[in-house]
């Protein structure tokens, strides 16, 4: 071991010093007496061997002592390090070690920040979902209201159309009933065929038509004709004098609940402009399209109708409102 080599070098150095001192002593003694030097040299050599052996034993003892001290120090250092590690481990287990507390504090701070951010994000998501829900509810309500208004207008227009047709039927029935009553009254007023009075012949001037049908058949035919004219349109119920047919200036017709006018199609619920000659155009919403007429609703809530023949003749014109 290095300790042994060092101790050996020290022993050799001490021996050299001893030898050097002894040599000086011997030279001085040689100068004093030459006779006594020979005897003393023999004695000094015997002392040197004993001295070396004694010093060697001392060095060995000292080396063993040093090795023992080194081993004791090493064991003591190991025990101290072990006790320090055990103490640090106990601090970590107890949660008091600085090496554990500092990262733990950083982790807790990071956890608090992320928890706060997650809470804010959750609130924003809930608010977004709530806004979407309210928007959908509002859109559904608006759609329902618009559909209700449209359905109300449609039902109202259909009911008005039915009422109009019923009124026409009532008028036609009144006419036929009057004719029927007149016929009954005329029958009651007839005289007895066995009476001597004869009916005076009717004098007719000019060409005339002789009807071979009975009065009841004529009344039935008249009622059927009136009903057929009522279904064609209100403007054809009343008999009109024959007029000269006018040439249609515009193309207008009704097909499957839609209106075709001058190359464009119009449907129920669309907003249009109605233009009449010498008048300002007005805005309206189409509510019903029949075979020969169009019902529309004005902004003030009033309803009116427009005959397709009026569009064909150019009395009225319509166009889309794109606003």
From Swiss-Prot:
The record's Gene Ontology biological-process terms are: negative regulation of transcription by RNA polymerase II
The listed locations are: Nucleus
Compositional bias ranges of the Basic and acidic residues kind: 1-15
A GO term from the CC aspect: Sin3-type complex
Q: Which GO terms describe its molecular function?
A: histone deacetylase binding
Keywords, ordered alphabetically: Coiled coil, Nucleus, Repressor, Transcription, Transcription regulation
Composition-biased stretches (Acidic residues): 16-51
- Highest taxon of the lineage: Eukaryota
Instruction: Give each disulfide bond as a residue pair.
Output: none
Residues in coiled coil: 50-82, 147-178
Give me the ranges of the annotated region Disordered: 1-56
Function noted in UniProt: Involved in the histone deacetylase (HDAC1)-dependent transcriptional repression activity.
Member of which family? Belongs to the BRMS1 family.
Which protein, by its recorded name, is this?
Breast cancer metastasis-suppressor 1-like protein
Give the source species. Gallus gallus
Q: The organism's lineage?
A: Eukaryota, Metazoa, Chordata, Craniata, Vertebrata
